[in-house]
Amino acid sequence: MSEAHTFHPTVLREYDIRGIVGSTLTAADARAVGRLRHRGRPAAVRKTVCVGYDGRLSSPELEAAMVDGLVACGLHVLRIGLGPTPMLYFATRDREAAAGIMITGSHNPPDYNGIKMMLGKGPVYGRQILDIGAIASKADYVSGEGSSEQLDIKDAYVERLLRDDDGTRDLTIAWDAGNGASGEDPAPPDREVPGKHVLLFDEIDGNFPNHHPDPTVEKNLVDLKAAVAEHGCDIGIGFDGDGDRIGAIDHLGRVVWGDQLVAIYAADVLKSHPGATIIADVKASQTLFDEIARLGGNPLMWKTGHSLLKAKMAETGSPLAGEMSGHIFFADKWYGFDDALYCAVRLIGLVSKLNQPLSELRDRLPDVVNTPETRFQVSEERKFQVVQEVEGRSSRLMAEGADVNDIDGVRVKDADGWWLLRASNTQDVLVARAESGTRRSWERLKGMVVAHWKPPASRPFLRGRRQLH
């Protein structure tokens, strides 16, 4: 029986579907998403869909409801079971399925969960996600007799991951899965890549008892840093909750941030793809874009968001893209989706074959002073108003000699450095950053941000740190 369904107004987001389980996101929502094969385009969707889920406590229930919805509209479902999101992406490509659907809360708090989707080879985002709400509200489905079966794709995924391991010497590596879906099974790199491995928190536990699985927050890397120091590791690798974002530590215990990793990868990729377009999001350090150009590549600044970067890669034929958040995408030898396990294999191979420590690769980039990604809570309406107000001053800023990029918020660059204000597409927050080569100039750029928008007195614009972040 087809019944109209209404989603909570907060769950249909720009890049995915997410909410608080039992409050804004329920099994009924998952089943409604499963009914996506609606009357308006039944011929556009082939019969097979891959479905997977992460290690959150609510994920099995949501996965079962999703499969129920897909089967109810006549689709054949390949259930890949528990594992990281990239394994679901791989299964969808490997089996040439019509779509892939992942139940995952990614790096959100334990009481959250969500749904990431791909249609064919591309991500589902923006208007496509909002369309799901319109379809469900009208009960605009087709009915049919579908089916489902279990698919064990893990061995094939691991084999394909390891095919691009081109290291020439063994390393000592610490791994922190954060009790997320990259632990236990398949856990390929931390058991199959040659070398010595130190494993942290690889038991999958949706309570996340040791630390939150977000390697872009430095406090979540404390245990990994300690393991690197204790065991004399060459590299420390951290994963987020569903294995599509990577964090890294060098042998000195320093964090190698997402944009620094992209610069390291770009040096390798551009050897086989000279002059290629390398994409990074608007939050990334200017040193990354300068380094890509120095290496002979074509740097392209683009909107933040894993779905948006994947789409831009496909449009431009880029072999590499990445975000400051640790979403990194290879399309030179890989499939163009964000896979932290694959990124780990490539990073280990680079350090091994170049016979250089990760710290030296990191230190090729110049020192800068910058803020981390700073978020200020504002209303949904106000966050866009602030950005529009700054955009309205673009002519004056350019007349003063600044370069203004409004591809995603407002990024203003002058002789001293740059500052950014953008509205988050997933939360009621404004995102701000500032970066310069000297502390004095950096203080001036921070003042520019404050002049254009007064942050709350309780949350001053943050102190800087050496090296890009």
From Swiss-Prot:
Give the cofactor note text: Binds 1 Mg(2+) ion per subunit.
EC number(s) on file: 5.4.2.8
Q: Which domain of life is it from?
A: Bacteria
Q: Which positions in this protein are listed as binding Mg(2+)?
A: S106, D240, D242, D244
Which cofactors, by name? Mg(2+)
Q: Does the record bear Ribonucleoprotein in its keywords? A: no
Q: Which UniProt keywords apply?
A: Isomerase, Magnesium, Metal-binding, Phosphoprotein
One BP term from GO: carbohydrate metabolic process
TM annotation in the entry: none
What protein does this entry describe?
Answer: Phosphomannomutase
Q: Which gene encodes it?
A: exoC
